[in-house]
Amino acid sequence: MTRLWRFVFCCLFLAGYTSLTGQHGMQNSLYMHERYAFNPAFGGMERSLAAGLLYRSQWAGLEGNPESRMINVHMPFYLWHGALGFQLVNESIGAEKQTGFLMSYNYIYESEVGLLSTGVRAGIYQNSLDGTKLRTPDGNYEGSFIDHQDVTLPNSLISGISPVVEAGVYFAGDYFEAGLSMTGFFPAGITLGDNLNFSPKPGFHFFGEYFIESFDQVSIYPVVYIKSDLVQSQAELSVRADWRDLITAGVGYRGFGKNSRDAMILSAGVRLSQKFYLHYAYDIGLSSLKTTHEGTHELLIRYNLGKRIGAGLPPRIIYNPRNL
């Protein structure tokens, strides 16, 4: 119990320390169930072939609202003492769209206190901006004619392909797991068309989870998740309960500063079969946008082969039911 209170205190301290303005990158309310999405070092940690299909509609009902689709697949690769994986991403917000394909490798080191993994993920992103969806105060939009009267904005669809690199570390012990990762680093920036080039800041992620031993077949997991671009940061605290690896329910709170307060998250999950899991999260908006949308919906379908592939990593000393 002393370990638990230390963990809770650290979570509250980190949440308060990082309560700056704004938010960075795409939000993800089911992050604790799909950690490979933001940390390539988590590959293979589920000890079998694992796949996830994620869909998120943020601020539903708001025109041009952010939408995200993601496919993650990873599996142990003992020949190289680690794991391999790939990620397919499609995101859209307003006139912008991104489609990415990335592959990853992570090396897993076993020690007396747990498993330590370091991983890297790299690939390409196709970025596009549809100028026909943009409007300016002085633009000319008679009929099908489009002229923004702004040389920095395109009047048609422009696109470009950019390389991207991501990296992370992850530790898994008997009662505690934590990871630190960097995502969305574009070494050459992003180029759209002939004239538009920009260099977005990479995102940094910290994830920490504590495992409370089961009682009455229920396991409790308090979690802290922090995202930052080193200018703006946002913290989220959540707790979830798993019952017999069959049903899960959780609640979370995102944003602890007056300018970063974002949402309260309610989530639930169920095991559909021996290999499939279904999760759903609903974000109740708390920011200034809360009156303009109908909440945020997120759906995750996960698959786990349920078999150890080959031989290599030993079973955990204490079984930590992460599957829900």
Residues of each region from the PLM?
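Bacterial N-terminal signal peptides that target proteins for export
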Residues: 1-9
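Bacterial Sec-dependent signal peptides at the C-terminal "C-region" and cleavage site
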Residues: 16-23
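Subset of outer-membrane beta-barrel
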Residues: 23-324
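Bacterial N-terminal signal peptides
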Residues: 8-16
